[in-house]
Structure formats: C-alpha cells, structure tokens
Swiss-Prot record:
Signal peptide: none annotated. It comes from Synechococcus sp. (strain JA-3-3Ab). Pfam families: DAP_epimerase. PANTHER family: DIAMINOPIMELATE EPIMERASE, DIAMINOPIMELATE EPIMERASE, CHLOROPLASTIC. Homodimer. Keywords: Amino-acid biosynthesis, Cytoplasm, Isomerase, Lysine biosynthesis. Its EC number is 5.1.1.7. This is Diaminopimelate epimerase. InterPro entries: DAP_epimerase_AS, DAP_epimerase_DapF. The active site is at residues 77, 228.
Length: 285
C-alpha cells in the first residue's frame, strides 16, 4: 500500500470512494495495483474505488479518473462524480453557481452542488446503439431492447444502455424477487458474458409504479455495491424504452434513493442524490 498518502473518504448512498487530490500532475499518483491495496477492506482503507482529482483537459475545470477495487478503470461513475463535486466544495473551490465542468473518460460531465447539499448531475445523452455500448446482442446500428440472453442456465430479457459505461438492465417480472436474487452468483456471469466485449455493469430492477423503481446492482470491477448512479440512470432509460415507466422517477437502491429524469427535449439524463464526507487520513510509512 502506498505510504504517506493523504486521502479523503466519501460515500454516495453507501457507494464509497477514496478521493486523492492529484491536481499537481496530469496522471494518477497511484498504480492500479496500489489502488487495489488501498481499497482492501481488511488490509487497506476500504472502498469501492479510488478517485483522482486531476487538472482539467479540453477546457474543463478538472478531470476525474477512477480505479475500481479490482484495479480496472471505469469511464465514469455517477456516485463517484457526486462525491468529487462535494470534495471540490469542501476544498473551498466554489465552482460556477456550485457547478463544475469535469472531464472524464466518458466525456464532459457537469455536477452541481445544490444549497441543500444534494448534488445534481447532467449525465449526458444515453447511448442506445449496440455498437456504442458495446455489445454483440444486435447489429451495431440497432438498439438492444428486451433481447434474450442465456446466462446461468436460463434465458433473461435484457436492455442495454451506455451512460459512458456499459449497462445491462434486467426487469424482474411478477413473481420475481430482488431479495431472493443470488446476485453474487449471477452478477459475474453477466459481467463477463462474451456478448459484452468490455464487460458490463448489470442492474436487476422492479417497477413499483410509473415513477418508482427498485434496483440491485452488480458493478463491473467492484461487484455488489449499495448504489450505482450510472446504473440508476440506465435503469430508468431502459424502463422508458420498454414502456414500463415515465421519464422521471425515484430509483430505490439498497443504500438509498436517487432522483432520475430523462429530459424528452434534450435527451439528457439528470441525476440528483447525496454525497457525504466520511473521514480524512494519511496512510502509514
């Protein structure tokens, strides 16, 4: 584990991150292997990932990089970027009306810290074509909506969405139970399915009303997490595509609720939720 590293622990609905102020150099100051050690919940600090605050690129105020707890790199993270915005505010960097232009591997994302402490994020326009996700479940120029997929000895109907990172959304029909779902078993099978060449996040959802979804998530590179911001966005988009929900809904996750809206005019997806500091520290020599 890296020695004498100053860090700050934040969480968004229980999805927890180690934040590192990396503005002094354009590349992360840790290797993926060091991030894995730092994320270890018994021998390290413990987290779902390490987020680096980097100098801005391409006209953005700042840049964000994220190593998952397995050492892989995520293009974007909804809960993570809310935590980054709160971290910037706590550093005394106010932003423009609380908003920050953040360069990510998924493009520019704009989180805004509201007066009530919640963070609203313009997550951009979802990518719906198979070639954009990417997945081989359809031709590259086609959408993937309610496509059959064989996983774990049974057939699932899946809808694929990219929020800058790949998502596979499965709606449990009547009689299905999120509580009874063996997520530890089936999650890795979805993540590593050959239909997703870059692996995938997977959301298992129930629609409790036109404006209310429940969700459990298997995150690519992190496993079971209490919440996933991009996953909540992808689930709402998938619910609208499958005509199960309206384009604005509360998404309930094990760690709490997010408010998600898919604007029918601009096609942008907006996410609102909390981000809170947990503690700050320095690793030992």
């Amino acid at each position: 584990m890296p020695s004498r590293l100053s860090f700050h622990k934040y969480q968004g609905l229980g999805n927890d991150f180690i934040l590192v102020d990396n503005r002094h150099q354009p590349q992360p100051c840790l290797t993926p292997e060091e991030a894995v050690a730092l994320c270890n919940r018994r021998f390290g600090v413990g987290a779902d990932g390490v987020i680096f605050l980097l100098p801005g690129q391409e006209g953005a105020d700042f840049s964000m990089r994220l190593f998952n707890s397995d050492g892989s790199e995520a293009e974007m993270c909804g809960n993570g970027i809310r935590c980054l915005a709160r971290f910037l505010q706590d550093l005394g960097i106010p932003g423009q009306d609380g908003a920050y232009q953040i360069h990510t591997l998924a493009g520019r994302i704009v989180p805004q810290v509201r007066p009530d402490g919640l963070v609203t994020v313009d997550m951009g326009i979802p990518r719906l074509l198979a070639g954009q996700i990417p997945t081989t479940l359809a031709k590259p120029e086609e959408k993937v909506v309610r496509q059959p997929l064989q996983v774990g000895g049974r057939e699932w109907a899946v809808t694929a969405v990219s929020m800058g990172n790949p998502h596979c959304v499965v709606f449990l029909e009547e009689g299905g139970s999120l509580e009874e779902l063996d997520l530890e078993r089936v999650g890795p099978l979805f993540e590593h399915h050959p239909a997703f060449p870059e692996r995938t996040n997977t959301e298992f959802a129930q629609v409790l009303g036109p404006n209310y979804l429940r969700l459990r998530v298997w995150e690519r590179g992190a496993g079971v997490t209490l919440a996933c911001g991009t996953g909540a966005c992808a689930a709402l988009v998938a619910a609208v595509l499958e005509e199960r929900a309206e384009p604005q809904a509360t998404v309930e996750l094990p760690g709490g609720n997010l408010e998600i809206r898919w604007d029918p005019d601009t096609q942008h997806v907006w996410m609102t939720g909390p981000a809170l500091p947990v503690f700050s520290g320095t690793t030992a020599e």
